[in-house]
Amino acid sequence: MGKNFLLEIGTEEMPAHFIDPAIRQMYDFSLEYFKNKKISLESVKIWATPRRLVVYIENLGEKQEAQEEEIRGPAAHIGYKDGMWTEVAKRFVEQYGASLEDLHIEETPKGKYIFLRKVKEGMNTLEILPDYITSLLKSIRFPKMMKWGDVDFYFGRPIRWIVALYGDTEIEVEIAGVKSSRYSRPPRFLPQIPIEIRDADSYLNVMRENYIIVDQEERKNEILKQINKIANENSFILDYEDDLLKEVNYLVEYPTALLGEFDKKYLALPEVVLIITMEKKQRYFPLRDADGNLTNKFIVIRNGTDNYKDIVIQGNEKVLKARLSDAEYYYHEDTKHPLEKYTEKLSGIIFQEQLGTIKDKVERVRILVREIANILGLSSEENKILERSVNLYKADLGTLMVSEYPELHGIMGRIYAKISGEKDPIPEVIGEYIYPRTLDDRLPSNFLASILGIADRIDSLTGYFALDLFPTGSEDPIGLRRISGGLLRLLLESSLKLNLRNLFVKSFEIYNFGEKYPLSQIDKGMGFIGQRLRNLLLDRYSIDIVDAVMEVGYDEMWRLKRRLDFISKFKEKESYEKLKKALNRLYRILPKDFTPKEVSENLLSSPFEKKLYEDYLKIKNEIFNDILEGNYEVLLSYDFLNEFSDDIEKFFDNVLVMSPNEDERINRLSLLSLIKLLFWEILDWSRLS
């Protein structure tokens, strides 16, 4: 029978975004550790607050399982003679503290040997737990690690106390100069009297009694209960991002929801400014009325009880008023001038130290946009809209509002463009080029915004690729993963017929690096893009489909997307298995570096190879142009594939491909190679499961 185990790591306040990754790591490590140590357990629970990381293991076994091991001893003919164990065998068992009854003889590849079957008793869990605690804390990786004082230990934030209990027994361990005990600490809003934890079983209740809700799910539900109660009692509608709830949950240990308000005059500001100020700057929950209009009310989550709540509300209202007053000033100052005026400031804003200013970037993007427009054959009106949009799309970076609220770039550009009287759809293009900002964000509704977004991201990535600023491990300070993710979604879902590699090469030319940076950096960049693309596609398609399609190239995302959609549907058809099997047979026989020649009909002697050649010509004439155009779905209704698959099988069953006659052999290999190349236009069939 096991006991419950408790480990509480008390720290200084941990940034909210550090906590979820730590929870996952602690859970995985704990399961793996005790599995490897062969100690049974019922469940592992990881709880967290801003100041505590907690492992709670239910019914952790009191000792390791006994392990049976076999030790090979001397050869049987030495240790066992005339039905008796020899002195050699006796010395062998004495060496391991065993008896002759534990010996047996087994046949091995090297002959018969004596083996000792020994049961190794498991260690007590109490002896193992100090190592578990130390190993666990050393294993956790945070987005940023820190060292404090003169201790040689790295963690997300300084460790201040450790509680470690197995049942009611203290586990003695010292980490980063902190010795474990059974005493936790109260929240900061209470007198700092240590909290005694008598045993692991009583932990949650003792913490609740001291105004600490350790379980993040319980805490989140408490927040939801309270904010919904306030909203319902006042006939308001809650409207907030999911990330806000997650962040607030990791900012408090004992949540209390309070209703505050601000001056109605600030409702004249753009709604997005109010929401960003409340959600991002202050972590408040905005409230709407029954008609969906934003109100001048908000909910703040206090870390503590409702004692002195009026003072707390007034303090939060005062802080919000100051922020909104600043925003009002920025807005009024910004709107004194048309948006175009702020383009003058772009030459003073650095894009990247070695890649120039934002103005330099705009000029590069302008050339790239013209190139894309030419490739796509845009109309003169569409070209004019794009030209004007390029002029203005970074202008809001020169405004006061975006200087204070960088996350509003593009969004304020759209608002200011409308106020400045820019004609539709220019404000829309300016405001939407930023999307998607994350992998699950929305896409632009206007394809011209997609073009601008593609050009902007291509320019950024080309510069970073040239400078070799690739992410290392989990670190990605420039945000290459985010930028490339947005680019890939635009290319995959916009269906614009563009070649990604060619755009990178063109962008590289526009930068005019000269001999400073090699063009080969684009190859390295495409490798990085390929890995990002594969990860993105694996969320939607099976691994064999993704690898089969990517193997034939991913320069043209529109083709890749069509190939993926085609094979996903084709897999459901009866002809799929036959064609895959036939083509795989063909793939296996072709030498890797074989270069096909033109097939000579005069050398086709067998009726089976003649028929296969006719099949090849038929497919080439009837649907190959469709395949080249990316119309792969024509194959879904192409009934000839069944007959073609049968003819490949008949060819292999009746024709000697590797003929002793060299001309005949090369001719047959050339026919097979041409068939492979024809279907290679779609995917690598050998990778399909």
UniProtKB/Swiss-Prot annotation:
One BP term from GO: glycyl-tRNA aminoacylation
Cell compartment(s), UniProt: Cytoplasm
Example GO molecular function: arginine-tRNA ligase activity
Record field: catalytic activity: tRNA(Gly) + glycine + ATP = glycyl-tRNA(Gly) + AMP + diphosphate
Keyword match Acetylation: no
Entry-linked InterPro entries: DALR_anticod-bd (IPR008909), Gly-tRNA-synth_bsu (IPR015944), Gly-tRNA-synth_heterodimer (IPR006194)
E.C. no: 6.1.1.14
GO CC, any one term: cytosol
Main location: cytoplasm
Assembly: Tetramer of two alpha and two beta subunits.
Family in the record: Belongs to the class-II aminoacyl-tRNA synthetase family.
Record PANTHER family: GLYCINE--TRNA LIGASE, CHLOROPLASTIC_MITOCHONDRIAL 2, GLYCYL-TRNA SYNTHETASE
Protein name per the record: Glycine--tRNA ligase beta subunit
Gene that produces this protein: glyS
